[in-house]
Swiss-Prot record:
Role of this protein: This phospholipase A2 inhibitor binds directly phospholipase A2 in the presence or absence of calcium.
Alphabetized PROSITE patterns for the sequence: C_TYPE_LECTIN_1 (PS00615), C_TYPE_LECTIN_2 (PS50041)
Subcellular location as annotated: Secreted
Species of provenance: Bothrops neuwiedi (Neuwied's lancehead)
Tissues expressing the protein: Expressed by the liver.
GO cellular component, one term: extracellular region
Keywords per UniProt: Calcium, Disulfide bond, Glycoprotein, Lectin, Phospholipase A2 inhibitor, Secreted, Signal
Entry protein name: Phospholipase A2 inhibitor A1
Length: 166
């Protein structure tokens, strides 16, 4: 919405900077208002389309979170930077259906990936004998969604988590 308002102000500023005659009949202002209303309608359509796609993807995975890979293989620190740059997060499944959606990505690619486990996690999916701190300070998920302790230096599939507050 701010972008639309700024666009309208920019158009008005361009008109005034050109030194054109004063718009006594308000034609320019009315034209700007029409353009602004058009931009608002287009923005509403785009927002609606985005929400439809998001809801469809959420319905298909059973999760309000999306897990996406760029197919790169990186260590934990590189993953953190990549997800941060993409405005995403390192996967942190909080529910069984989220873990299943995450595991579906891993199964499709036949690879393991890092995840983070919060201190107050109500949901966990540790494999038998895990967590095993001797194996490392990080956590990885296998293609079945089971969690294992891992070295943070392991090179695993890059998967970032994206979620939306609707």
């Amino acid at each position: 919405m701010r972008l639309i308002l700024l666009s309208g102000l920019l158009l008005l500023g361009i008109f005034l900077a050109n030194g054109d005659e004063v718009d006594r009949e308000g034609k320019v202002v009315n034209s700007l208002i029409d353009a602004l209303m058009h931009l608002q309608r287009e923005f509403a359509k785009l927002k609606g389309s985005f929400l439809i796609v998001h809801k469809a993807r959420s319905f298909g995975s059973g999760s309000e979170r999306m897990y996406v890979t760029n197919k790169e293989i990186k260590n934990f620190e590189a993953l953190r930077q990549i997800c941060e740059q993409a405005d995403g997060h390192i996967p942190s499944p909080q529910l069984e259906n989220q873990n299943k959606a995450f595991a579906n990505v891993l199964e499709r690619h036949g690879k393991e990936a890092y995840l983070v486990v919060g201190d107050s996690a109500n949901f966990t999916n540790w494999a038998a004998g895990e967590p095993n701190k001797a194996a490392g300070a990080c956590v990885k998920a296998d293609t079945h969604g089971s969690w294992h302790s891992a070295s943070c230096d392991d090179n695993l599939l890059v998967v970032c988590e994206f979620y939306f507050i609707l």
